[in-house]
Structures are given as C-alpha cells and as structure tokens.
Amino acid sequence: MKRHFNPTLVLFGVMGSLLLIDLLLPIANLLLHAHWSKWAADLAQPQALAALKISIYASTIAMCIMTLLGVPLGYLLARVNLPAKRLWISLVFLPMVVPDLAGGILLLQTFGPYGMVGNTLGTANIELTNNLVGIVLSQLFVASPFVVVSALAAFASVDTKLEQAAATLGDSRWRMFWRISLPLAWPGIAAGITLAWIRALGEFGATLIMAYNPHSLPVYMWVKFESDGLTGSLPAAFCLVMLAAAAVAISMLLSRLTGYADVVTRLGPQEKAA
C-alpha cells in the first residue's frame, strides 16, 4: 500500500530528532573519544573502586527501602480516599523538582549534628552524616518519588472490578493485594524501581552536602574534576553512564522474559482485522 506524504508527521519527526540529538550526542561523543585502556586503569585505582562499591551498595540499600515503603504508599494513594489526597501526592512529587543541593541542605538541617533528628540521635552517639547512612538518606530523598509515582500509576491502572470480584469471593484486602493488584501492577512498578536505582546511583548534590566522605562515585567524579579537570573526571562519568545503560538493558530483558515487553514497547496488542 502506497504511503502518502504527511507533513504533520514529518514536522514531528524533525522536532523529535532535535531532542534525540540533544540526548544522544553527549553519550556518542563520550564513546567516540574514549581512551579505554587509560580509563580502565583509572577506574582500577583503589579510590575509584571504593567509590564504585559505595555507590552500588548504598543505591541497592536505598532501592530495597524505597520498594518496601514506596509500593504500599503508592497503593494507598491509588486505592484509598485519604484526607487531602492531592496534597499528599503533591508532596511526593516535591523532591523530584527540588534542586539537589537544596534537598541536601534540608536533609542536613534535619539529620545533621545540630538538626532535629541528628541532635537527638547524637546523644546516643548515632551519626547520620558523612557515612553510608547519610548517602542512603540522600538517595532516598531524591529517588523514592520514582517508586511511589510509578506504583500509584500502576495500581490506578488495575481494574477495580477484579478486586471487587475477589472481595465477593471472600478474599481479604491483603490477599487481593498479593494475588491480583501487585502482579498486574508489577511491570510499571518494576520500571519505577529501575529508574529509582539509577537516580540513586547518580545522586550528587544532596550527597555532597550530607556525606562528602566516604566518596560515592558522583562525588569522586567531582573531586577528580576539581583536581584534574575534565580529563580526570571522564572515567567516572563513563562508568556511571555504563551502569545506567546496563540497568535499563537488564530491566528491558526481564520484561521481555516475563512477558511484559508490551508495557514498554507498545500500547498493547492490536486487534486483527476481521
């Protein structure tokens, strides 16, 4: 069948291509000018390896906490008519738009040595800054909204009639959550968890304020940029980009293996013409 020229689609294609260039050109430029052997040697240095381990460890801990706490919150916001529900949803979105450095200052004011929580725990010799806990707290603040918002949208997309039918058969809310709501919403939730882990891994601003030491990989990259300039910071930047790409690839692969590829590749199966 002959395709007709559609100026609207051409215009949209040009506009979209400009955005893709802005998104992909920096990554392509990084790969084209890569010094593989030198970067590998730089990343094999003890300080770089320590920063990488800390970032992966902290972001994984943060991801587990975000999943454990964020998924139930998303379910509540999707299914329960809470008082001031719109306000709670807006508050969940807030850390996504607050500048990272401002978020770090807020965290330090609360959890720092002279903060409301930090001062209280300090009497028991419990410190929440300049350690792994401080890094995790920073990552939770900036990345947890991705899990909550994704869970909220995923649970809201589940047909409530399925839960109502299960309720008429005597299923409890707890049983309906595990047998109906969570399995159907999981593809969207998993996508949010992946994005949250990537966001936590690359968190810089709040971590810089809350836990400059021990260096996470983004903070280490900044230290190298200050001491050695752009050339010195490129290996860490490359490592972060590759980790993010690997996380996205693994997420897509798992979606395909579990039969959820349609969620991220198309709107849904198309009906065949009769």
Model-derived features with residue positions:
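Hydrophobic positions on the alpha-helical face of helix-turn-helix-like DNA-binding modules
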Residues: 165-166, 176, 180, 221
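Membrane-water interface segments at the C-terminal ends of transmembrane alpha-helices
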Residues: 3-37, 46-156, 180, 184-200, ...
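Short, Lys/Arg-enriched, Gly/Pro-containing loop segments at transmembrane-helix junctions
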Residues: 258-268
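Membrane-helix/interface signature in polytopic inner-membrane proteins
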Residues: 152-164, 173
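Short hydrophobic, aromatic-rich alpha-helical segments embedded in or entering the lipid bilayer
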Residues: 212-226
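Glycine/proline-centered hinge or cleavage motifs at structural transition points of membrane proteins
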Residues: 169-170, 183
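Short coil/turn motifs that cap or connect alpha-helices
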Residues: 83, 172-173
